[in-house]
Amino acid sequence: MRCPYCGNEDTQVKDSRPTEDNTAIRRRRFCTACGGRFTTFERVQLRELTIIKTNGRRVPFDRDKLMRSVQIAMRKRPVEQERIERMVSGIVRRLESMGESEIPSAMIGKLVMEGLSSLDAVAYVRFASVYRNFREAKDFEEFLGELSGPLGSSLRDEDEDR
């Protein structure tokens, strides 16, 4: 593995263990040239997935991009990183087990919305605002009006706490 600090190809694995949810192997590495230490994660990839964007363009699936978009929605929310990681891993497993190699981006958005709805109500609304392309305050109002059940009451409870 190439060192991210100096580019040297000669690195050593110092520690290797499964992640808590057993979906990856975490490896601590050491560069013999510069002494830098870094962590890598090794995951099973069942198949190469291609995402079909709304404009028809096809791009390779990027798990890190999915994780970044979820983390943006979760920013400053009281949810443990491990729960976020589990949700993203679950989405990736569902995508890989669908049997399709080409997945519409709307399907990923739908799966993220499902996951966030049970994880954090505010993050759910944040993600929805991008996924559904909210343009005005009334878009938020309409969306919040559509919500019913535990998620809607959870959002109303948070609003009353302020």
UniProtKB/Swiss-Prot annotation:
Residues 1-21 are annotated as: Disordered. InterPro entries: ATP-cone_dom, NrdR-like_N, RNR_NrdR-like. A zinc finger (unnamed) spans 3-34. GO terms for molecular function: ATP binding; DNA binding; zinc ion binding. One of its GO terms (biological process) is negative regulation of DNA-templated transcription. Residues 49-139 form the ATP-cone domain. Its cofactor is Zn(2+). Residues 11-21 have a biased composition (Basic and acidic residues). Binds 1 zinc ion. Pfam families: ATP-cone, Zn_ribbon_NrdR. HAMAP family: NrdR (MF_00440). Belongs to the NrdR family. Negatively regulates transcription of bacterial ribonucleotide reductase nrd genes and operons by binding to NrdR-boxes. PANTHER family: TRANSCRIPTIONAL REPRESSOR NRDR. This is Transcriptional repressor NrdR. It comes from Parvibaculum lavamentivorans (strain DS-1 / DSM 13023 / NCIMB 13966).
